[in-house]
């Protein structure tokens, strides 16, 4: 660390300690809150209809580059509903998972270590070695017991966050990797000014809690030695805001452009290809595993990454999508609709042709039941040929946060009916829904 950064960092620590003593004294002896006291069913406003599957509602996703302008009440645990709509908290061997998936009736989950600030992934209770830049949006568990993870890789030279893909064994040994550099440039970034934009404006005010979390990830040993865990926990509750310029001293990745923001991956054709959903490109693309080349792409109307478009979609395509899935020659995705200011979010289905993306044709859409835009997160999962499970994702700050919101739906495409729906109470949300 450069001398000027050391001085600035120590000064910040001294200031925060002073503020803690002055303003935090009244609460110094009070216990911190615990998710163990939370009843998961308190999040649920209503459940209607019947689901044959067990439904997993995952926690909300957080990562290094996410702005703090969306609700995150489910970040500490997930909900699971049995076929009888009985809600239960998922029991894991850690208190604060931030993502949960389920493979072979076993949970794969991730969290941030309170000791080191590192991103950690566990499957069936065992830690899986990832990488320094591990991203939590999606994983693949292969039949041979290996894993494919996504990475958000910062590049200080061009101030960009690039996409990395790695297939590893349980010990972290790299079996295959791919890097977006050389394939994708940040000039194709489709920026939505009011979205969960990972590039912070220069005048943005950031809460001290966010700053300290970032500092701890970069300088964890120093922070722990100077502050100690207990004092650190007190500091994150202080409502102090510092400017972006101050924040930049302690996070070298601030103001880097997250121009891809991949949020789902799926292997295709016996693992010859990988389908990637790239939210900030308003596009999907397919990588040929053997060559690393992008061999297929499809974009929404605002995408400059590709000229390939869907046929027959009343919107002309999708925007800032999540969770692209191929199932029986159909392409399913969640259209967050960030760039469509007057249209609600939706689940949408197209035909799929791996030889020619321009043959993709609109088949079906299901609009957000309350006609709202859900600007972040969300998921789509085909349960069979006719039924889709939709997780509706984030609720932005504003009037909508004061209302009940739909959390998940099961829709029958054949007759365009809702078979099952769960609504959250105001302020609750989930990253995605999965049926098993």
Locations of the language-model features?
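Histidine-/acidic-rich catalytic cores in large beta-rich domains
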Residues: 18-436
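N-terminal Sec-pathway targeting helices
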Residues: 1-14
């Amino acid at each position: 660390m450069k001398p000027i950064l050391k001085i600035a960092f120590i000064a910040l620590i001294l200031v925060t300690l002073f503020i803690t003593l002055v303003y935090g004294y009244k609460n110094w002896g009070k216990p911190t809150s615990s998710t163990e006291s939370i009843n998961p069913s308190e999040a649920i406003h209503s459940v209607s209809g019947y689901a044959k599957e067990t439904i997993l509602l995952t926690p909300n996703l957080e990562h290094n580059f996410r702005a703090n302008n969306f609700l995150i009440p489910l970040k500490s645990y997930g909900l699971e509903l049995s076929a009888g709509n009985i809600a239960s908290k998922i029991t894991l061997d850690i208190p604060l998972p931030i993502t949960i998936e389920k493979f072979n009736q076993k949970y794969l989950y991730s969290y941030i270590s309170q000791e080191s600030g590192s991103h950690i992934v566990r499957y069936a209770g065992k830690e899986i070695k990832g990488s320094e830049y591990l991203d939590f949006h999606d994983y693949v568990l292969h039949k041979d017991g290996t894993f494919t993870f996504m990475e958000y890789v910062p590049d200080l030279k061009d101030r960009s966050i690039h996409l990395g893909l790695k297939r590893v064994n349980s010990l972290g040994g790299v079996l295959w990797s791919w890097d977006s550099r050389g394939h994708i440039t940040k000039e194709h970034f489709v920026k939505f000014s009011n979205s969960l934009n990972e590039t912070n404006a220069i005048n943005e005010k950031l809460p001290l809690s966010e700053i300290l979390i970032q500092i701890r990830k970069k300088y964890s040993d120093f922070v722990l030695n100077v502050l100690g865990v207990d004092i650190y926990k007190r500091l994150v509750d202080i409502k102090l805001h510092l400017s972006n310029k101050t924040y930049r001293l302690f996070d070298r990745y601030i103001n880097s452009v997250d121009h891809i923001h991949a949020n789902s991956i799926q292997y295709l054709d016996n693992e010859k290809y990988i389908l990637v959903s790239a939210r900030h490109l308003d596009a999907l693309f397919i990588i040929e595993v053997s060559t690393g080349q992008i061999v297929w792409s499809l974009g929404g109307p605002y995408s400059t990454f590709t000229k390939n478009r869907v046929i027959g979609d009343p919107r002309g395509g999708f925007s800032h999508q999540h969770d692209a899935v191929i199932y029986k020659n159909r392409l399913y995705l969640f259209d967050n609709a960030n760039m469509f200011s007057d249209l609600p979010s939706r689940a949408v289905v197209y035909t799929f042709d791996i030889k020619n993306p321009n043959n993709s044709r609109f088949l079906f859409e299901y609009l957000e039941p309350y006609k709202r835009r859900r600007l972040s997160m969300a998921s789509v999962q085909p349960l069979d040929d006719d039924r889709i499970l939709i997780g509706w994702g984030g609720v932005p700050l504003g009037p909508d946060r004061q209302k009940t919101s739909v959390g998940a739906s099961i829709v029958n495409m054949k007759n365009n009916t809702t078979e099952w729906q769960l609504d959250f109470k105001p302020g609750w949300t989930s990253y995605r829904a999965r049926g098993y």
